């Protein structure tokens, strides 16, 4: 990677290419933005991210475009932007109506993007949102804490966290790792058709935060991460 080293950046993929940007090097926040072409094994710098330089944002690829939003630049944020790889242009879109946040996780199912978890000024975020690109609007879903009088969410308080990761298998999303600030290994499965979460088997690796994740076929993968001063390189 030819850009400056950094942590807490974001990435997404669109049309079989990878895109990477933002982040923090301990002194400076970044807003530069890069494209990786696996066929040529080359990085190309693209148009800078138009929001403030930041870290701990969230990102996803959706309908041949990429999205980056929320994060932290010294203040908590919830602004959102869409990137079109065809012309390397950015456009600001409407933000969700809920909390600002850093360290959220996002996933895409059936061309709908979902954003949940994170941290906002001393509180772990409980609101949960989906973005429909055809309507260009955010829709609020059920909270990820025990806020209703019904029994379905009695255990939901263990969903909230910051720096968790998610991946999608067969139309369902899986959330694991992260912390509150105690590190978590409990894992949850989300079914969008009924807007419900179900607790599943715990993550078997060492507890960690700031991990990366992806899915391939019928399996999900969690890689790297940290616990206090220890850094992981297992998968």
For the regions a language model picked out, list residue spans one by one:
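Kelch-like beta-propeller repeat domains
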Residues: 1-235
């Amino acid at each position: 990677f030819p850009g400056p080293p950094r942590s807490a950046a974001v990435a997404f993929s669109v049309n079989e290419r990878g895109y990477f940007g933002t982040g923090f090097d301990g002194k400076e926040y970044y807003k530069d933005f890069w494209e990786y072409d696996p066929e040529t094994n080359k990085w190309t710098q693209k148009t800078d991210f138009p929001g403030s330089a930041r870290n701990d944002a969230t990102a996803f690829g959706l309908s041949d475009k990429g999205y980056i939003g929320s994060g932290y630049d010294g203040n908590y944020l919830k602004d959102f932007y869409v990137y079109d790889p065809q012309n390397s242009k950015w456009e600001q879109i409407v933000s969700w109506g809920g909390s600002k946040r850093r360290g959220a996780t996002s996933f895409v199912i059936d061309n709908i993007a979902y954003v949940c978890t994170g941290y906002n000024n001393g509180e772990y975020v409980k609101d949960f949102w989906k973005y429909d690109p055809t309507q260009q609007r955010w829709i609020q879903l059920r909270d990820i804490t025990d806020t209703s009088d019904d029994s379905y969410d009695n255990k939901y308080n263990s969903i909230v966290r910051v720096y968790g990761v998610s991946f999608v298998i067969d139309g369902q999303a899986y959330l694991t790792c992260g912390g509150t600030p105690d590190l978590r290994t409990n894992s949850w499965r989300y079914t969008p058709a009924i807007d419900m979460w179900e607790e599943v088997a715990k993550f078997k690796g060492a507890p960690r935060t700031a991990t990366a994740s992806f899915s391939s076929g019928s399996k999900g993968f969690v890689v790297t991460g940290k616990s206090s001063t220890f850094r992981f390189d297992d998968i």
